[in-house]
Amino acid sequence: MKLSRRSFMKANAVAAAAAAAGLSVPGVARAVVGQQEAIKWDKAPCRFCGTGCGVLVGTQQGRVVACQGDPDAPVNRGLNCIKGYFLPKIMYGKDRLTQPLLRMKNGKYDKEGEFTPITWDQAFDVMEEKFKTALKEKGPESIGMFGSGQWTIWEGYAASKLFKAGFRSNNIDPNARHCMASAVVGFMRTFGMDEPMGCYDDIEQADAFVLWGANMAEMHPILWSRITNRRLSNQNVTVAVLSTYQHRSFELADNGIIFTPQSDLVILNYIANYIIQNNAINQDFFSKHVNLRKGATDIGYGLRPTHPLEKAAKNPGSDASEPMSFEDYKAFVAEYTLEKTAEMTGVPKDQLEQLAQLYADPNKKVISYWTMGFNQHTRGVWANNLVYNLHLLTGKISQPGCGPFSLTGQPSACGTAREVGTFAHRLPADMVVTNEKHRDICEKKWNIPSGTIPAKIGLHAVAQDRALKDGKLNVYWTMCTNNMQAGPNINEERMPGWRDPRNFIIVSDPYPTVSALAADLILPTAMWVEKEGAYGNAERRTQFWRQQVQAPGEAKSDLWQLVQFSRRFKTEEVWPEELLAKKPELRGKTLYEVLYATPEVSKFPVSELAEDQLNDESRELGFYLQKGLFEEYAWFGRGHGHDLAPFDDYHKARGLRWPVVNGKETQWRYSEGNDPYVKAGEGYKFYGKPDGKAVIFALPFEPAAEAPDEEYDLWLSTGRVLEHWHTGSMTRRVPELHRAFPEAVLFIHPLDAKARDLRRGDKVKVVSRRGEVISIVETRGRNRPPQGLVYMPFFDAAQLVNKLTLDATDPLSKETDFKKCAVKLEKV
């Protein structure tokens, strides 16, 4: 495709900006100089965060050589963040894996052996032997999978089918457990359905933005650019930012609030009290569309049952609640006075009042945004519920320019982990394994015997680590994630299980990550546009892309790996006789035939692909695998408020926001005139609940699982930086991004550094009760912690900060709190 004049000018502008910054943009600038005809362009969503920016990918001679923002993409409108401009280089690191590697000694597998190249058949041989042995000796609960919010939609769907229907094990969980699980449970408790009701179009219509534990300037920079434009172009627009430390988003804030860790719960209840005391309740909305419930308290911290905190909890893991009156709710929040809140949070009273006034003002359209500050929290579900309370009390929800919005961090945490249902307790379209009706729906659609899908919830992410350590989980396959670096409490709860000789660990990844190097078998994986894919972003937008280049060497997509491995198992080897007796026609068939090469999935011929269109999996199998899997999966949500468009529509569009009914996407759910599931005259209907009403929960402040004391005297918070994404397995292989932020540092208040005889640039040992790492003191820069708190990013494999973190989780969502543990510092 030729570059248009608009694209030419945009490319040169990008090149000029990059030159000014001392960077070299891969492709776009070079594409406009003498090679316009040679480069082929096609659309794709960005490989990084959950914003879902659209990019144009330029390929030449079988390689991705260029990338630019897609001017027709409604999310980013042609703009990329710094990571997006370097997308081509993530695929071509010098250490890209191109063949399977098995730990071997003397020509055979050995847990202590060296990684040795083998063939795919040899890799599947050893995997088959390990899986079959575990299934025969200990049953389905002895095998597990850890997947990803970076899986494509059909990869997650194929994995879920293989484990839940094929192997009859619900021990499959995504890394989204570490980032979005609290948001999921929060949505389900309050609304009965997952995912936001609003969309990014709210930004241009809002009067106020409140960020709760979200550094959008670095983590969602394209959305932040839209918020910045809205704020700077309208003097009446207000931005409030709440965090436990000062970061780049504070630069735009009219009200920048730094609070004591965990005390966001106090602030949320104070605002609810303020709304009530100032008669700011939207009485019409509240009386028609809201119920009130009091939640169980003292629910523990998701630690091992033997931990003292779990033994002391009165209602460990309880999500119980009971109806309550408005007067009781009013009395409950009345305890959270301005004075008490200021004392508990350390926030000045005037700042608290300014914040509360935004929500209480009936003429202010308010959007609440949050990410990991809320979700990675031992009371993360409660925090989600409590922010919904503010919008439900005021009726500021499901309308243009106002509403609560949970931002996601991975490109398909919504589309794959949540919507497909790759969590240990979920099935497609918000269905769950504990519901017999839901299991029956899936079993009938998949044409498998009734009773195949287990009713017992499988092991969640942290429980998988513990089960590996305890020898209960023995074969473990991780895909598209680097949990040995990203997960909590590496020393005590993860590494022991991975290196236990009783266990066999498989890692599928494009690069030799910390996880891969700790495994027994490494499978080289195709990435991004080396396969056909689909992601679902934070605003319910499903986006497709075509395969545009082939993977290097013998690297294969996660989808190929799952489907081909399923050929190794016949139904008699994985299902008991009582199940086979219900469907005798399935005897002797492989799981490939039962799950993937079915009449339902294989009915779309490969001839639907253009003659020159790459699609390695479908051309090898002889049918359009991705289309078949997607259409089967989409069936579950159609007619139930999760409607997805037909497969072919997505290749033509720049994404569509579900529910898509009669060809029309939905911008705002639950409100009349916007949502096709809300009838005329209903006004609002939260149809995830049987009575159509959302729930306001009374939930108190409860302390963190671990706080500073005399010995471990500092809070530690962990997170990300703009230049790197998660564990840096892709971005650190981009030279320009690596040079921009080459190693992790410990951000610390200058007075805390001085008190410990530390200076900027000094090496420092950071020590918790679980481990220690060496880092570099940073008293300046983008992050400015208050006294008593230090901040450290987790992208650096040489500084595994998660050796320090505690594996405490929200007891309801099972999501880890990476934001709060206690450490001490020692000068090196």
Swiss-Prot record:
Binding-site list for [4Fe-4S] cluster: 46, 49, 53, 81
PTM section of the record: Predicted to be exported by the Tat system. The position of the signal peptide cleavage has not been experimentally proven.
Sites where the protein binds substrate: 794
Domain 4Fe-4S Mo/W bis-MGD-type: 39-95
Cofactor: how bound: Binds 1 [4Fe-4S] cluster.
Family: Belongs to the prokaryotic molybdopterin-containing oxidoreductase family. NasA/NapA/NarB subfamily.
Catalytic activity: 2 Fe(II)-[cytochrome] + nitrate + 2 H(+) = 2 Fe(III)-[cytochrome] + nitrite + H2O
Enzyme Commission identifier(s): 1.9.6.1
Signal peptide limits: 1-31
GO cellular component terms, semicolon-separated: membrane; nitrate reductase complex; periplasmic space
A molecular-function term among this protein's GO annotations: 4 iron, 4 sulfur cluster binding
UniProt xrefs under Gene3D superfamilies: 2.40.40.20, 3.30.200.210, 3.40.50.740, Dimethylsulfoxide Reductase, domain 2
Keyword Nucleus (UniProt): no
Subcellular location: Periplasm
The name this protein goes by in its record: Periplasmic nitrate reductase
Assembly information from the UniProt record: Component of the periplasmic nitrate reductase NapAB complex composed of NapA and NapB.
Residue positions binding Mo-bis(molybdopterin guanine dinucleotide): 83, 150, 175, 179, 212-219, 243-247, 262-264, 372, 376, 482, 508-509, 531, 558, 718-727, 802, 819
Record key words, sorted: 4Fe-4S, Electron transport, Iron, Iron-sulfur, Metal-binding, Molybdenum, Nitrate assimilation, Oxidoreductase, Periplasm, Signal, Transport
Organism for this UniProt entry: Shigella sonnei (strain Ss046)
